[in-house]
């Protein structure tokens, strides 16, 4: 398999600041899992799409690959600056991070378009079968991906435990990018280096294999499919 398929630099888009993006695999030691105290679920005042209550149980059970959780990691909260868009594949623990110019819907959607081009238009909905997001306004356009065959679900407000894997991965990223430190201080290459270190760690829950190894096997299966569409 061509390993570069998993973490190639995203192409620069003409006339915008996305040149510093990089598609990056992250993963983390399961031993660092923190217990989340569940809170009372509040009513959702915003409706960006399908609720997580309608998500098939098979996705939570991690029976198959291709189901993701999405989030953003911010630096300084004041002012406009870059953030990191992160996704974790639930079965393999494979983590993707993309540096984007801001915490807004347009930046998120351009990043997802980069991913669609990266993995291939014909295979995008096979690699990304579903994505579960929170109700942040940066994900307000995420349901547009359903046009490509991706199922989009939204967690309840103030219910981070419904995306526990992504939350855990983001906490590990904070070892490298502490809270309050600007994302602009880190290049795409530095973020990739952080990711490579974490990605190389075997996991007990994965049979002492790495997320990268398992995700590459998943991609091999996807790209071996005969898709006539």
Where are these regions (language model features)?
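C-terminal domain-tail junction helix/linker
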Residues: 179-229
